Amino acid sequence: MARRSSRVSWLAFEGWESRDLPRVSPRLFGAWHPAPAAARMPTRWAPGTQCMTKCENSRPKPGELAFRKGDMVTILEACEDKSWYRAKHHGSGQEGLLAAAALRHGEALSTDPKLSLMPWFHGKISGQEAIQQLQPPEDGLFLVRESARHPGDYVLCVSFGRDVIHYRVLHRDGHLTIDEAVCFCNLMDMVEHYTKDKGAICTKLVKPRRKQGAKSAEEELAKAGWLLDLQHLTLGAQIGEGEFGAVLQGEYLGQKVAVKNIKCDVTAQAFLDETAVMTKLQHRNLVRLLGVILHHGLYIVMEHVSKGNLVNFLRTRGRALVSTSQLLQFALHVAEGMEYLESKKLVHRDLAARNILVSEDLVAKVSDFGLAKAERKGLDSSRLPVKWTAPEALKNGRFSSKSDVWSFGVLLWEVFSYGRAPYPKMSLKEVSEAVEKGYRMEPPDGCPGSVHTLMGSCWEAEPARRPPFRKIVEKLGRELRSVGVSAPAGGQEAEGSAPTRSQDP
């Protein structure tokens, strides 16, 4: 029998998944923290929310929706009777009524293709298979699997002593939890937490059991020559800070570089997988990856772009020093970088002037293009950059090249306002509500009418009506020629080659 954790939680013993244990006196097993009353109250689902059904309705009454347990639906509207909703079934496409009691939040269950790249995620395997994978026993050896008994759920499996303990991951108000005391936005956050603090589980998570046959991003990077030597790296002053670590100035083999330091090993793995994508991208308008260093987390070594981010560049120079033609060139540079990403079917997710860097020769370069997705995994929707994020991404988490186009429209407004914050004097809530009702920003002072028209096309409510970046590049090229400036040639370079020793920075 598996050992009990020091706090009452939902446990499963060898081969069994979690069951709701009876309430036990905290004097027997240490402190017990029940979920707050508010967390146990039924949730009101807003239109557009994706939910999962908790039961089956195979014989619906007229007007009701037919569904099976584990089906995904999208809420269309709440009924006057607050215990019912009208929803659309993802599989059949049918619309109908279903009871609120049959629903739970499905946001955490949305398929994330990068989850399969996590070294500890084994997908759909049984509890018995998990036990076999976690042999020989080793305290803290772990994996995460999809539940066979509860479709859509996850199970954390941990080796401890001679046992493998299975913790069912519960869904509470759009978050994930094991003990109903500590909640997480996603599985990556949960795993990272338990590598630092064992909390309600039997032991800290120490070592992931890698899925057999899966090639790690680390192996791919090493084979291609992208792993750099820590001994050649000198770190300098901090020049920025992101959600998961600092950005530092540095030198590698005597050349200036920028270094993003991700300290947590589990978070570093997510960034490492994203970095593997970046090695295959080369374009004059993308900040160049030079390599990575694995040491107490992850160092991502990038080219140093001397004039800093575009927001500060514009704010510190203003109209007196930066002409309209230069603004158009910056916008075109960004659009060309994004057209390249779009052609590779990659989505940035955090396109904004703060993430555009300006080189010594005034070339604008898109940064964090391979890392935005890893960063967004650790953020809940309330912490997304609301003023730059497309409505469908805010509402339903639907990121695409078209949501990047929306963000590009906001970036255009930033550029032609010389670095002002968009939606001035409006709170995030006011912005979200106003945009949903059709509000769009007025043009900045001095902005050409044709550029504001382009912004408007980027802000179409229907994503399909927004132009692709290819069309945006064509439009900005015409604008530049109309003011007597030749548009630069395309910036694509050779792809997929890692830096050789002679190319080391």
UniProtKB/Swiss-Prot annotation:
EC numbers for this chain: 2.7.10.2
Active-site residues from the entry: D350 (proton acceptor)
Binding sites annotated in the UniProt record for ATP: I239, G240, E241, G242, E243, F244, G245, A246, V247, K260
Enzyme type, top EC level: transferase
Residue ranges of domain Protein kinase in the record: 233-481
Tissue expression per record: Most abundant in brain, and to a lesser extent in the spleen, the thymus and the liver. Also found in the T-cell lineage.
Region (Disordered): 483-505
Pfam families documented for this protein: PK_Tyr_Ser-Thr, SH2, SH3_1
UniProt xrefs under InterPro entries: Csk-like_SH2, Kinase-like_dom_sf, Non-receptor_tyrosine_kinases, Prot_kinase_dom, Protein_kinase_ATP_BS, Ser-Thr/Tyr_kinase_cat_dom, SH2, SH2_dom_sf
Main location: cytoplasm
Subcellular location: Cytoplasm; Membrane
Example of a GO MF term: ATP binding
UniProt keywords, alphabetically: ATP-binding, Cytoplasm, Kinase, Membrane, Nucleotide-binding, SH2 domain, SH3 domain, Transferase, Tyrosine-protein kinase
Record's keyword annotation contains Cytoplasm: yes
Cellular component terms per the entry's GO annotation: cytoplasm; membrane
Function: Could play a significant role in the signal transduction of hematopoietic cells. May regulate tyrosine kinase activity of SRC-family members in brain by specifically phosphorylating their C-terminal regulatory tyrosine residue which acts as a negative regulatory site. It may play an inhibitory role in the control of T-cell proliferation.
Entry's family note: Belongs to the protein kinase superfamily. Tyr protein kinase family. CSK subfamily.
PANTHER family listed in its UniProt record: TYROSINE-PROTEIN KINASE
Quaternary context: Interacts with KIT.
Protein name: Megakaryocyte-associated tyrosine-protein kinase
Organism: Mus musculus
The gene coding this protein: Matk
